[in-house]
């Protein structure tokens, strides 16, 4: 469906990471495509990007909240604003670390998969590192209380209790 046709966007799903050989990561990340996939709920969109299938996962972007994604080529995380229509803008460099997936906890801390799992507060200050048995690629919070960080690696899937 056309991007502008969807009203009252609840969330958008964007690539968790991008590899851009042409060093056009910033422009591609805030580009607004003409079309999007619309979920059955009628308010969740997936903007149609030519490199959508290249990403290791999709991350949820909620209007009014910051969205983080990884620039694989330059190995850094960027932060963007999410508008009411689900589009991204105001890209800024957040931390000089990042390879694949990331996840944000209830307090706004950012967990970044980059060989290990690095933890940053909402201002970009490094809070720590979580060693894992295998190079992480995708991160997602879940569990009964939302305090388990689920991690995928090349051959393993495991959970790390955060609190």
Where in the sequence are the language-model features?
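Short glycine/acidic-enriched loop and turn motifs that connect beta-strands
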Residues: 5-8, 74-76, 156-158
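A detector of repeated loop/turn-to-beta-strand junctions in beta-rich toroidal repeat architectures
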Residues: 30-32, 74, 88
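A short loop-to-beta-strand structural motif that recurs across blades of beta-propeller domains
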Residues: 33-36, 76-78, 116-118, 156
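Beta-strand initiation motifs
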Residues: 39-46, 84-90, 125-128
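Short loop/turn segments immediately following beta-strands, especially the blade-tip
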Residues: 80-87, 161-163
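Short, basic/aromatic-enriched C-terminal tail that caps enzymatic domains
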Residues: 150-163
